[in-house]
């Protein structure tokens, strides 16, 4: 079952992206490098509740 998650910037703590993930295949919190429009650079984004 796919669940909705929110990705937050680790620099400015803004929640920039909404996406889905397969909980069974990826039980850990997701981390990815994405563009933050508030920081105006590519930063690490982590999954939030």
Curated annotation (Swiss-Prot):
Keywords: Ribonucleoprotein, Ribosomal protein. The keyword Ribosomal protein applies. The gene is rpmG. Coiled coil: none annotated. HAMAP family: Ribosomal_bL33. It comes from the Bacteria. The keyword Ribonucleoprotein applies. Belongs to the bacterial ribosomal protein bL33 family. GO terms for molecular function: structural constituent of ribosome. NCBIfam families: PRK00504.1, PRK00595.1, rpmG_bact. GO terms for biological process: translation. This is Large ribosomal subunit protein bL33. InterPro entries: Ribosomal_bL33, Ribosomal_bL33_sf, Ribosomal_zn-bd.
């Amino acid at each position: 079952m796919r669940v909705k998650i929110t990705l937050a910037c680790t620099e400015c703590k803004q929640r920039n992206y909404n996406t889905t993930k397969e909980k069974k295949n990826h039980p850990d919190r997701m981390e990815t490098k994405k563009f933050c429009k508030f920081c105006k650079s590519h930063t690490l984004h982590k999954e939030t509740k």
